[in-house]
Amino acid sequence: MRKWLIFLLIAAVAGLSACSTSGNTTVSDDLVLVEGGAFKTSKSSYSDKNVTLSDFYIGKYEVTQKQWMDVMGDNPSGFKGEERPVERVTWYDAIEYCNARSIKENLKPYYTIDKETTDPDNKNENDNIKWTVTINEGANGYRLPTGAEWEYAASGGQKSQNFTYSGSNNPDEVAWYWMNAGEKPLTGDWNWPAIENNRNQTKPVGQQKANELGIYDMSGNVREWCWEWHSHPETPENTWRISKGGGWVSSVNTAEISYPGKFDANGLGPDQGLRVVRSK
């Protein structure tokens, strides 16, 4: 009888643990609810594709260095500052962060990461990692946005005012990019020596104007990883992952909502960060 009681106690504890890992319905206060629907803007690359999205949550800000350190225990960023966006993170780093944060917050991880099996779909000759990453359908944990979700949120969702950039037609109101991310404004054509001499760098999140949904920095500051492969008729399939929004070193056109950004999944750009999403 005693053995059965011990067994039942262990089973009950295991059951509670399983529930705590996947049954947490609390939503972090740094997430914004995005009401789903069809695109209201004409400035998205998905505007004419009859895409309809479900409700989801997205980070009000890019993932900060403090948020990254609290979960991962290190800080790969070149421009240090707790409230600056984390940068120099690969797509694989971003996937691992999503799962680790999910576990930390007692959510079910959205991804299964197989580091021993080379992804057969990955055609990028420069990618020396090529982990196989699959989705756990129905999981409530953190994840990267799809390209469509990213552009939908950046354009203001159902509240869109049809801006070119996320929250404005004037990039200087909403974006940190090569002309305004340094000690003084720059003019003329994109120029790396001028950028370097001007001490351009990332800025603490949330300093520019928010977009229609109250989301900050979806244009500029750092580029943001998305989940799927970049797809374009003039580029090879399954080679780059989508990277959106442009960054502090980028030309202004990359900050446009529709700009088709891409990057090697193992790339460590000084303007490459992320923003998280959760399904509703």
Swiss-Prot record:
Residues carrying lipid (N-palmitoyl cysteine): 19
Any one GO cellular component localisation term in the record: plasma membrane
UniProt KW Cell membrane keyword: yes
Topology of the protein relative to the lipid bilayer: Lipid-anchor
BP GO terms, sorted: protein folding
Signal peptide: 1-18
GO molecular function: formylglycine-generating oxidase activity; protein folding chaperone
PANTHER family noted in UniProt: FORMYLGLYCINE-GENERATING ENZYME, SULFATASE MODIFYING FACTOR 1, 2
Free-text function comment from the UniProt entry: Is required for the expression of the adjacently encoded xylanase Xyn11E in an active form. LppX seems to act as a specific chaperone necessary for the correct folding of the xylanase during secretion across the cytoplasmic membrane.
Record protein name field: Chaperone protein LppX
Name of the encoding gene: lppX
